[in-house]
């Protein structure tokens, strides 16, 4: 039984352990699956990254409202560092995020300017926490529009 039997497109499978580029953190929102995938392809990350998907992306990792989830992310990040020797973490939050509303309230996402500031603050906190726990990693953070346009923050 070959890959064609199952209608699968063959691809090069790398070893579970090795040297990979990054972990990509993104949101569970179904609207963001294709834009995030497209970004990864454009960044030449296909087959070179591990992925962690959680409601809110960085918000799910740092917001007190989701504190029970935090350990799962940090444990997974530690595992991908150990197994994949990643060099950086890429956190992609997105606009119109329901988890942001749950975590911070409607007023914190009431208009695009306020929404941007809310995400910038969460992404800055995420960057800070990664730096404290894993100072060897680079951290890239951004806010993606529903159309896939990504605004990066440093």
What are these regions (language model features)?
Residues 91:
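Donor-sugar nucleotide-binding helix/loop cap in glycosyltransferases
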Residues 47-57:
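A short beta-strand-loop structural module common to alpha/beta enzyme folds
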Residues 37-44:
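Short Gly/aromatic-enriched secondary-structure transition segments
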Residues 94-96:
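Short, ordered loop/turn segments at secondary-structure junctions
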Residues 1-11, 16-22, 27-36, 57-73, ...:
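Divalent-metal-activated hydrolytic enzyme cores
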């Amino acid at each position: 039984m070959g890959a064609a039997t199952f209608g699968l497109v063959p691809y090069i499978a790398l070893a579970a352990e090795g040297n990979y580029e990054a972990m990509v953190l993104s949101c569970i929102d179904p609207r963001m699956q294709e834009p995030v995938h497209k970004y990864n392809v454009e960044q030449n990350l296909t087959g070179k990254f591990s992925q962690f998907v959680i409601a809110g992306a960085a918000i799910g990792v740092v917001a007190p409202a989701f504190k029970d989830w935090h350990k799962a992310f940090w444990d997974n990040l530690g595992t991908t560092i150990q197994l994949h020797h990643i060099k950086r973490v890429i956190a992609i939050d997105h606009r119109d995020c329901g988890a942001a509303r749950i975590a911070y309230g409607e007023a914190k996402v009431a208009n695009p300017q306020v929404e941007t500031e809310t995400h910038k603050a969460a992404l800055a906190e995420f960057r800070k926490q990664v730096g404290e726990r894993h100072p060897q990693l680079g951290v890239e953070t951004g806010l993606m529009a529903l159309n896939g346009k990504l605004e990066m923050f440093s």
